[in-house]
Amino acid sequence: MQLHNLEYKKGSRNHKEKRVGRGHGSGLGKTSGRGQDGQKARKSGMVRLAFEGGQTPLYRRVPKVGFNNDRFANKYNVVTLISLVKYETKELTVEFMYANKIAKNEDLPIKVIGNAVLPSGTVVSAHKFSKGALESISNSKAKAQILE
């Protein structure tokens, strides 16, 4: 490909600007494609979104509902036991998980979930464990160390 062989993508240069109010012959003269008189024929004539002609709009007729706990929820880096099995170290610390990108956000505490068989003697350190994870760790003769 060379500079003198470059071409525009097909259909990319066909859109012409709509010139309105330039006489009958243009096809968009007189009313400029706005139809006859009425609010929508005026320059600022569109009504706002969800306007229902003075009737109380649906979003005000329907009551507010529910509660979202997002602001108050405790957020965690969730780490599965299956993702920890492939590392052949005896100590799986929080620093190790951050360093190996097992847990992404260093600002959040780590919660270990899931069920997998860890090598016996492994010590897993985290801020929180699910019941299933604690059960799996104790069944595989490993230790769970809960951090503050």
Swiss-Prot record:
Give the species. Ureaplasma parvum serovar 3 (strain ATCC 700970)
**What is the protein's known function?**
Binds to the 23S rRNA.
Q: Give the region (Disordered) as residue ranges.
A: 1-42
Give the gene symbol: rplO
What GO molecular function annotation could you give as one example from this UniProt entry?
A: rRNA binding
Query: Assembly and partners?
Result: Part of the 50S ribosomal subunit.
Ribosomal protein among the record's keywords? yes
Compositional bias (Basic residues): 11-22
- What biological-process GO terms show up in the record? translation
| Domain of life where this protein originates | Bacteria
Query: How is this protein named in the record?
Result: Large ribosomal subunit protein uL15
Keyword terms of this UniProt record:
Ribonucleoprotein, Ribosomal protein, RNA-binding, rRNA-binding
Cell inner membrane as a keyword? no
